[in-house]
């Protein structure tokens, strides 16, 4: 096994399963997820909760098997950008800080970007099916995930005003 292809396989499995777990966690209690989304400033929170669950389960599954890899990675980048911009950036960098900093979502975003750029490797369905986004489009698709996340924040999120104000 080529070490690069083996490494990409491991990254896809770990990140894919992690993102699937996030989506399943949201999906198990959509009403609770929607209430939390509303509390942290999202408009249309019930829709956002459903979309979050579907996106995370779908993108994680696609990344896991290496199908449409740059698009799956872009969806993960978008999701982590929304998480960083709406919640984690206000709590500093480190994940162990109160409220959880942006360290974790940053790392997931960069790993997803690298996977978008390199593709899923030899052990991905993209390779088996002859799907290749190319050296130019793959990183651009990853960057489009960042733009989609920023767009999501602009359209659907406002920082909540603390109750004491």
Description of each model-found segment:
Residues 1-28, 32, 46, 50, ...:
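Extended, low-polarity transmembrane helix blocks
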Residues 32-39:
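Short amphipathic alpha-helical coupling elements at transmembrane boundaries
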Residues 41, 66:
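Conserved functional loop/turn residues at catalytic and ligand-binding sites
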Residues 54-63:
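Hydrophobic, membrane-inserted alpha-helices
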């Amino acid at each position: 096994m080529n070490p690069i292809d083996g490494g990409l396989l491991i990254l896809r499995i770990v990140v894919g399963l992690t993102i699937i777990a996030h989506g399943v966690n949201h999906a198990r209690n959509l009403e609770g997820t929607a209430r939390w989304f509303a509390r942290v400033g999202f408009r249309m929170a019930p829709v956002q909760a459903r979309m979050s669950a579907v996106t995370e389960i779908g993108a994680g599954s696609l990344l896991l098997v290496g199908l449409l890899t740059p698009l799956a990675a872009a969806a993960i980048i978008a999701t982590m950008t929304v998480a960083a911009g709406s919640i984690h950036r206000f709590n500093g960098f480190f994940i162990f800080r109160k409220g959880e900093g942006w360290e974790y979502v940053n790392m997931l975003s960069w790993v997803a970007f690298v996977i978008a750029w390199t593709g899923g490797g030899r052990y991905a369905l993209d390779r088996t099916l002859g799907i290749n986004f190319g050296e130019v489009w793959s990183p651009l698709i990853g960057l489009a995930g960042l733009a989609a996340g920023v767009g999501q924040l602009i359209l659907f999120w406002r920082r909540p005003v603390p109750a004491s104000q």
